[in-house]
UniProtKB/Swiss-Prot annotation:
The gene is cmoB. This is tRNA U34 carboxymethyltransferase. PANTHER family: METHYLTRANSFERASE, TRNA U34 CARBOXYMETHYLTRANSFERASE. Gene3D superfamilies: Vaccinia Virus protein VP39. Homotetramer. It comes from Salmonella newport (strain SL254). The lineage of its organism: Bacteria, Pseudomonadati, Pseudomonadota, Gammaproteobacteria, Enterobacterales. Its EC number is 2.5.1.-. The keyword Plastid does not apply. Belongs to the class I-like SAM-binding methyltransferase superfamily. CmoB family.
Length: 323
């Protein structure tokens, strides 16, 4: 059973303590009523993983854990099999005692694009909205964060996160909660808030920006990464039924339009830090994610377009500050 008591004890002693007025009841309701049909199978995979304490742990350059002496073939096989029971692995990669999880996304590439533009994360309390398996939570800790909290309602991601945590020595500096941003009160408690790969899935993107702002302390920093299209501050793509085979894509603004949205929501010092086209080297099918990936979502005769005829995915990073 995945428990959250350690997190409750941790925040009871800091400036997140007021979250305890609502959070335990929400988690209890989730445990009673909302668990996925495969959750028991996934949580069993986590439970059966061995307790490991890394001899060498690198969260600064990657997410890598090593033992002092190589694991036996049987130990490696056990870890590998249990981690494969948590497929598909979308966000990573992870290197855990000789088991290399080659995830669909090279999330380390995204981190390398984002990191140079951030305020120093040393000592910061961070929220990562839609954090997936929690890969970036560990990289935030590697960059000096005091506490990294991720929220994502996808229960497979929770189990993947807890599996990695167990293999990292039960590290308590990062935590993942199975919640959506709309379930959080206005905590106004995080020094940095990340929203990466979420905005285009929201029916009301400006409401999402307000929700993110409500989580930041005054002078806190927002890091927003999302799909964009080319154009000026009035350009927004509203896809039809699907975009790159995804049904739940609602609004894809240009980077200048997104900057304007942030300013309309009251953010200041808004800047476009990076814009780049997503490549089939960064998002692709692997043995840890065996279904369709980006190459299958692009027009085979014109890779600058999706199969639906829209511009192929490009992503922007915007940095903003709450006054």
């Amino acid at each position: 059973m995945i428990e959250f008591g350690n997190f409750y004890q941790l925040i009871a002693k800091n400036h997140l303590s007021h979250w305890l007025e609502t959070l335990p009841a929400q988690i209890a309701a989730w445990q009673r009523e909302q668990q996925h049909g495969l959750f028991k199978q996934w949580s069993n995979a986590v439970e059966f993983l061995p307790e490991m304490t890394p001899w060498r742990l690198d969260l600064l350059h990657s997410v890598t854990a090593e033992s002092e002496t190589p694991l036996s073939e049987g130990q490696l096989k056990r870890i590998d099999t249990l981690l494969r029971n948590l497929m598909p692995w979308r966000k990573g990669p992870f290197s855990l005692y000789g088991v290399d999880i080659d995830t669909e996304w090279r999330s380390d590439w995204k981190w390398d694009r984002v990191l140079p533009h951030l305020s120093d994360l040393t000592g910061r309390t961070i929220l990562d909205v839609g954090c997936g398996s929690g890969y970036h939570l560990w990289r935030m800790i590697g960059a000096g964060a005091h506490l990294a909290v991720g929220i994502d309602p996808t229960q497979l991601f929770l189990c993947q996160f807890e599996a990695v945590r167990k293999l990292l020595g039960n590290d308590q500096r990062a935590h993942l909660l199975p919640l959506g941003i709309e379930q959080l009160p206005a905590l106004k408690a995080f020094d940095t808030v990340f929203s990466m790969g979420v905005l285009y899935h929201r029916r009301s993107p400006l409401e999402h920006l307000w929700q993110l702002k409500d989580q930041l302390v005054n002078e806190g920093e927002l890091v927003l990464e999302t799909l964009v299209v080319d154009g000026d501050e009035n350009t927004v793509l509203v896809p039809g039924d699907r975009y790159a085979q995804m049904r739940n894509v609602y609004f894809i603004p240009s980077a200048p339009a997104l900057k304007k949205w942030l300013e309309k929501c009251g953010f200041i010092d808004v800047r476009i830090a990076d814009v780049c086209v997503t490549t089939t080297e960064e998002q692709r099918r692997t043995e840890w994610m065996v279904t369709e990936s980006l190459a299958d979502f692009l027009d085979p005769n014109d890779r600058s377009k999706t199969v639906e005829g829209y511009p192929a995915p490009q992503r922007a990073v915007l940095i903003a500050r709450k006054p």
